[in-house]
């Protein structure tokens, strides 16, 4: 039989669009780049952790930063999605013990050098918070598809867990 090459695109998630304005001189770090060691969180100063998802990623970095962190969440409780795993109350206990400031029901509107502007989700009242950087823990989206691929799986379709990506990759390979 054949033996021709078949390309399956499996990777490619990138940071999604930001729901806030950011000046060119503002320090905005993508959590994926921080975790990969591509960029580093400044060693000193307040860090705003923007967590529009309410999952473990924003909670984990805020917990690590401790009292330096200001966790901005649109939800009524930090890490709202952790309720499904049973870690909601323990995570909030850890955040409190670490000294993390939590800005609940808060939307991030703009990032400037040295400050962010936030808005109360319900009242619309805006105010500023001083910080040296923002770590964006927002949504990921797939990259543009490659030309002439037989299939797209994993992060090429939408962000996945490692388990989901490996499973989809194996299924795609088995179907070739």
Predicted regions and their residues:
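A conserved beta-strand/loop element that lines the FAD pocket in flavoprotein oxidoreductases
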Residues: 1, 96-108
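Rossmann-like dinucleotide/flavin-binding elements
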Residues: 1, 10-83, 119-176
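Short, conserved catalytic or adaptor-binding loops enriched in Gly and charged residues
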Residues: 20-24, 92-99
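Alpha-helical protein-protein interaction modules
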Residues: 83-90
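Short polar/acidic secondary-structure junctions
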Residues: 108-109, 121
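Generic beta-strand structural signal
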Residues: 110-111, 152
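Short, hydrophobic/aromatic-rich segments at coil-to-beta transitions
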Residues: 113-116
